[in-house]
Amino acid sequence: MMKKNLMLIFGGVSFEHEISLRSAYGIYSALMKLDKYNLYPSFIDKITGIWYLLDSVPDAPELIKRDSSAIISLIPGCGIFVNDEDLEIDVVFPIVHGRTGEDGAIQGFLKMMDIPCVGAGILGSAISINKYFCKLLLKSFNIPLVPFIGFRKYDYFLDKEGIKKDIKQSLNYPVIVKPAMLGSSIGISIAYNDTQIEKCIEEAFEYDLTVVVEKFMKVREIECSVIGNEQIKIFTPGEIVVQDFVFYDYDAKYSTIPGNSVVFNIPARLDMKHLLDIKEYAFLTYKCLELRGMARIDFLIEKDTNLIYVNEINTIPGFTDISMFSKMCEHDGLDYESLVDNLVSLAFQSYAKRKERIDFKRLEN
């Protein structure tokens, strides 16, 4: 049986570029061990956005070679080319975190190219990455969320005092301020009073045009891995215990060694009710957002009340050596290599289902 051609896309014009490189190295290593696919590692430069075909995914960013003779051309309706040679890609595994990778852009382009894509589709990606619109949708399905307010930059500067008053009255201090479309806790800060809120909001606007402000609470941070298309597998949740940080920010996630300031507990220490509720909310969230392939759904449990809240959805979760997504799957018996292989299979299955639905010859006759 001939091997399929798999393109692994990583890097990207994104604040999460460096995390993508680490995730790509893990996935590439797993795919090499599987030896089931012809691999085409494709790197997107952070500054120029140029796509380069690489020989492999190096374990250090400085080893990436930007060879002008290996620039990738993408032509909808024709194919993916390097030096006029069609690579004949059968499936793409995008591991670009944040903008262009998780917002539906790559997914939409690959749909136009008629190439199967690992992970969520256009709609699920676009909604999930935008914290504000995602919360509005989940709220309409009565999924529990931390009290929040969202607004665009234009509206804020049009009525700054009105929005600040609304935050104080509706949420009360302290509050946590987030750019709507960034992951890895980039651009997030906490405001404890009227003086700080303005600074926090304006800092968040440096990253995005929409900001979400949430009530800040003392919480437990629970994460849940989910994979599947029509049939969904929900894995045993894990807990992140943050010891030396106010919340699980970028430094806590990627600049510390697990076991020092951050401890991963898999499984999370939950009573049966909380365990079942979290799995149910994970299932409902996955379905409401029309996700497929994979997602990591993050939860908060308020320490004072024990109430559960859905926090964020990651349609392309981290695959680094310290990422929770694969570790939770591994706890339930699905090792890293098998997880990666399953995700590629799910992409082919989803593509085949979509092609069945869109049978133009049958519909037109």
UniProtKB/Swiss-Prot annotation:
One of its GO terms (cellular component) is cytosol. Its EC number is 6.3.2.4. It is found in: Cytoplasm. Mg(2+) 2 binds at residues 312, 314. It comes from Borrelia hermsii (strain HS1 / DAH). Binds 2 magnesium or manganese ions per subunit. The keyword Protease does not apply. Residues 135-345 form the ATP-grasp domain. Its main location: cytoplasm. It catalyses: 2 D-alanine + ATP = D-alanyl-D-alanine + ADP + phosphate + H(+). The keyword Nucleotide-binding applies. This is D-alanine--D-alanine ligase. ATP binds at residues 168-223. Keywords: ATP-binding, Cell shape, Cell wall biogenesis/degradation, Cytoplasm, Ligase, Magnesium, Manganese, Metal-binding, Nucleotide-binding, Peptidoglycan synthesis. GO terms for molecular function: ATP binding; D-alanine-D-alanine ligase activity; metal ion binding. It comes from the Bacteria. Pathway: Cell wall biogenesis; peptidoglycan biosynthesis. One of its GO terms (biological process) is cell wall organization. Cell wall formation.
